[in-house]
Curated annotation (Swiss-Prot):
GO cellular component: cytoplasm
Family recorded in the similarity comment: Belongs to the class-II aminoacyl-tRNA synthetase family. Type 1 subfamily.
A GO molecular-function annotation: nucleic acid binding
Catalytic activity: tRNA(Asp) + L-aspartate + ATP = L-aspartyl-tRNA(Asp) + AMP + diphosphate
Record-given protein name: Aspartate--tRNA ligase
Residues annotated to bind ATP: 220-222, 229, 484, 536-539
Subunit structure: Homodimer.
Annotated organism of origin: Lactococcus lactis subsp. cremoris (strain SK11)
The protein's enzyme class: ligase
InterPro entries to which the protein is assigned, alphabetical: Aa-tRNA-synt_II, aa-tRNA-synth_II, aa-tRNA-synth_II/BPL/LPL, Asp-tRNA-ligase_1, Asp-tRNA-ligase_1_N, Asp/Asn-tRNA-synth_IIb, AspRS_core, GAD-like_sf
EC number: 6.1.1.12
Length: 590
């Protein structure tokens, strides 16, 4: 029989009609001679009722055999439900079955198919096809679809052209580790899966497409966490002849449409702007969560007047004030905060409580003579807790920024109903890497430096590392609730400037030509001013769905070991396959 509608869509409009629905048994109950079956599909649940005394024999037998997760086809008459269930859309009706066909049986599932189920993450991933049956997961996946549909509608209407770029690319440095793909035809050579379509989309601008977009898979071999996966999806944009503000305005309109279409929320435009230095100095993060205050305060000048060696020897002394919460933090809980500060690079965490007009605990004895000065500077009131980090500027910001987020959650300062969008602008072009022991591009090597600071890139033999700190970028990140939602920039469209940039990053001219020769050559052929942005689709949908891990909005994600418990990927391959690729494994037996 042809399905009349989804089970979850059968409402009072079908009263007294004979219909057919198909789906999975969510629950079966035998109560007082009547058999009730909750039939589930992607749209919801409808109640089926069978009276074995009046139903046809084959209907009663099928209802008696049915068990959870059996797949049924049910035909019957829609009648008004005596005991209504206002919690579901179909709660006003039920279907009196006149025919039931068992389309498929099911073993007992390894976990219940319901939302609030306690099960190990790897078990969920091993049986992901079952996990996706849960209403919450179905909702997440359909929300993802609604998001991409809204994005495409906006970009198509704004004159963007959807272009596919290649997955088999050249491996280039200046990023995370690549996933490499060996070439059988070109023995000993490798493709790299793209970390982004960055260079290809720039080439599309010199090709004259003017406005490009793509919702595209990208790949990065990096350490995983809740908002990272080895393969992820981004909304990739590039435009010609637009400035920073125009690209930002276009992005805001795109996001506003998604918020309205998917969440029914009207967001206020334009989004606030905050320069990078303010984000770091006041929030301790380049992706500040602005849903709550708890700002960082620089106390360096005042702190160095105190007879406390730790303060006097530090580059900076910064603090956060936890208002009215001193009595909520025991020494043990402060010790936990200290450990977190150390994990973020700090040597330690100093603290005091302000109680009844005096400092108590922690380093209070060192501040006794300067109590009024600190009270005035920090605007302290009774029962405040003050946390200090004395260190380099970067470490103080990073450590207190992390504590700020922890305390915000502990104290219930965050309004989780809010969606606070923010642009972080005026970025430095370079950032120091302790691991590489050199300056690296804060975004990527193709970002356009500001005219005012381009001179510091000069490779005339006099450039110092310290000069690179002064170079600023036409770069902008969009932040949502403390997550980097996306990042973009204006790009370099001059070969000379691009070569200067690569030189500043340590590339010799011959190395630059070997790695990026195709781009450098293209810059000789009338490259228009251009810029763009990439939004993390997985992260965006995660935040829209109110989740804290992007696995919840990806159909078939990897676990924290970059493995798939369901397919057992990655896996060992046959020796013959390796031979065809001219690959020999080192330490194969280890």
């Amino acid at each position: 029989m042809k399905r009349t509608n989804y089970a979850g869509n059968i409402t009072e409009e079908y009263l007294n009609q004979t219909i057919t629905v198909k789906g999975w048994v969510a629950k079966r109950r035998n109560l007082g001679g009547l058999i009730f079956i909750d039939l589930r599909d992607r749209e919801g649940i409808v109640q089926i009722v069978v009276n074995p005394e009046t139903a046809a024999t084959e209907v009663a037998e099928a209802a008696d055999k049915a068990r959870n997760e059996f797949v049924l086809e049910v035909t019957g008459k829609v009648v008004e439900r005596a005991s209504k269930n206002d919690k579901i859309k179909t709660g006003g009706i039920e279907i009196e079955a006149t025919a039931i066909e068992i389309l498929s049986t099911s073993k007992t599932t390894p976990f219940e198919i319901k939302d609030d189920v306690e099960v190990l993450d790897d078990t969920r991933l091993k049986y992901r096809y079952l996990d996706l049956r849960r209403p919450e997961m179905l909702k997440n996946i359909t929300m993802r679809h609604a998001t991409t549909r809204s994005i495409r509608e906006y970009l198509d209407g704004a004159g963007f052209i959807d272009v596919e770029t290649p997955f088999l690319n050249k491996s280039t440095p200046e990023g995370a580790r690549d996933y490499l793909v060996p070439s059988r035809v070109n023995k000993g050579e490798f493709y790299a899966l793209p970390q982004s379509p960055q260079l290809m989309k720039q080439l599309l601008m010199t090709a004259g497409l003017d406005r490009y977009y793509q919702i595209v898979k990208c790949f990065r071999d990096e350490d995983l966490r809740g908002d990272r996966q080895p393969e992820f999806t981004q909304v990739d944009l590039e435009t010609s002849f637009l400035g920073e503000e125009e690209i930002q305005e276009l992005t805001e309109e795109l996001i506003a449409k998604v918020m309205k279409d998917v969440k029914g929320i009207d967001v206020t435009l334009p989004f606030p702007r905050m320069n990078y230095d303010d984000a770091m100095n006041f929030y301790g993060s380049d992706k500040p969560d602005t849903r709550f205050e708890l700002l960082l305060t620089d106390l360096s000048a005042l702190a160095k007047t105190v007879d406390f060696k730790v303060f006097q020897e530090a580059e900076v002394v910064k603090a956060i004030v936890v208002k009215g919460a001193a009595d909520k933090y025991s020494r043990k809980s402060i010790d936990k905060l200290t450990e977190q500060a150390k994990q973020n690079g700090a040597k330690g965490l100093a603290w005091v409580k302000f109680e009844k007009g005096e400092f108590a605990g922690g380093i209070s004895k060192f501040l006794a003579e300067s109590t009024d000065s600190f009270v005035n500077e920090l605007k302290l009131t009774d029962n405040d807790l003050v946390l200090f980090v004395a260190d380099s500027l970067d470490v103080a910001n990073s450590a207190l920024g992390a504590l700020r987020l922890t305390i915000g959650k502990q104290q219930g300062l965050i309004d989780f109903r809010k969606f606070n969008f923010l642009w972080v602008i005026d970025w430095p072009m370079f950032e120091w890497s302790d691991e590489e022991e050199r300056y690296m591009s804060a975004h990527h090597p193709f970002t356009l430096p500001t005219k005012e600071t381009q001179a510091f890139l000069s490779a005339d033999g006099h450039r110092k590392d310290s000069d690179l700190k002064k170079v600023r970028a036409h770069a902008y990140d969009i932040v949502l609730n403390g997550y980097e939602l996306g990042g973009g920039s204006l790009r370099i469209n001059s070969r000379d400037l691009q070569e200067e940039m690569l030189s500043a990053l340590g590339f010799k001219l011959e190395d630059a030509n070997e790695q990026f020769g195709f781009l450098l050559e293209a810059l000789d052929y009338g490259f228009p001013p251009h810029g763009g942005l990439a939004l993390g689709l997985d992260r965006f949908v995660m935040l829209l769905a109110g989740k804290d891990n992007i696995r919840e909005v990806i159909a078939f994600p990897k676990n924290n070991k970059a493995s798939d418990p369901m397919t057992q990927a990655p896996s060992i391959v046959a020796d013959k396959q390796l031979e065809e690729l001219s690959i020999k494994l080192a330490n194969k037996d280890q």
